[in-house]
């Protein structure tokens, strides 16, 4: 092993000079919208994003009824339709049977799967194990996959989901990696917290190494062919991986020179994972999605890496179209509440969305393809992402309250020890949901990023706990102490009696003899080890210690009162940042768009009223409204025509994408494209009431479709991926 685990984390914190040169960030590409598909182009899935990530040299392991298209043929089919073509595949699993069965190098490699304590391999699909990424496997990935896609002219590579299951760690392949990494024999992770911590640090390192090696090779091989290869990591959020008990390198990758960016893989499937609030476990899709997207933004923002936000109109688990629609609106709204992110993966697997059969309602066994009203709404929504601006506007609510996170959140989830449990990641949600549910747009900050001055630049009060994570390097504490000394405020929650406090780590080895990791931080600020609950001054700042684990704030009804009272007092009296405002909604004005979320389980059941000259973008009929009430548990998405430049005719909202626009003194024409078997609907701004509306040369003008107040015409027709020609005359 050439680099220690601690050195990896130092680099992730912006403290490694070799990586700092890369941390300024490479040039971002021009792709704003993209999607992933393992299929060749076909008219039913032609969603008209800027780019497509063609999935897998051999496709997706779950593909059925393949038609035998080669990778190169699939790429060509999309290029012929005007798409920029990129490549995506899994780094932890994939269509790699030629490796597992020995076709590649003459040796079977099924023993390199991730294995549980019972000796069972963890499978992603038939003959598709989750992998312990050995050096031999990485050689295979470079030679058989990366080289081939670059030879096909692909210049952007997405290696998704670097995942090592927390319950794995018992295979012979893992034992070999353990011996090489630590220099001593493997130890079963279930036998002690120490072993669990060691095992999970190794899992973290193995996929850090894997992506570093594969991406470095991709860039070097591309350079030899005169190509500038971009490399991205599509990954779940730290919130989700921690909750699902998966270990992944996450934040440390952002500072690697070979990593150009990420896709934040957040969707209904991740965000509906139940969590606790006010003593009740429940799905809270909007709130969880908001925290997931936030953790991805804060993880990369200081590094300048490109970030795509993903949403999915359905999910992996078969449910019904009513469920899919409601939760898609929630996750879609959550992503838009981050105005500094404006690049999107608009959907994964359009073949599954447009061609899959799902229940028409929760109380019906009938299955059908996506309803017309939902495909129309979905296409209107994703088409707006092609024009979504970044914005300096902020979400409504009290600013400056952040929750500290660490990659080590993933290290303490499984197995449990000494009876200490953290149900559904409640030590994290216990700091987040009491505020978020009351309309406070809490942010997250990553301990690995504290070396970047931007990490805490907008934080007034930092909430932290070591009950569910540990600092992986003492340097982070130096940054925190310096921040407090200059006037920062920390609210530390923790009994510091979880079993991972005693693992052999930097705070209790060598010259350090601290019983709890927090005692090292406290010592830097003149606070005694094991300090009692209370308030402590350091420099211009304040530390308040609450001797309760954050899970206690949400596992029982009303358990968050003292926590909330303390946060509010620290914010107003110590940070002197004003009064913490409680409400049941979030609102953001983003260019011409209004984004609204109204929460249940909050401070009131009052609706949020949006006013203006509004196109309702969640309504497939695109009505123009003067106001609309959004009730708790629902979201709203609107274009306000009062904020649209009236500088000529234009398509304002549509379920198709517009090309070849031409404007003359008394006419406006264009070509629209979208998948077959879907409804085309457009609300078009015009300088005057039209006298003629032509669709493919046929007159379709209907006076009832003209709205004089908004000066817009509502046009509908059948979509066509080959193009529909439209012309307005006035």
Walk through the language-model features, giving the residues of each:
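Catalytic domains of carbohydrate-active enzymes, especially glycoside hydrolases
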Residues: 29-77, 81-84, 147-157, 257-262, ...
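Glycine-rich, aromatic-flanked loop segments that form ligand/cofactor-binding clefts
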Residues: 69-124, 155-166, 218, 222-233
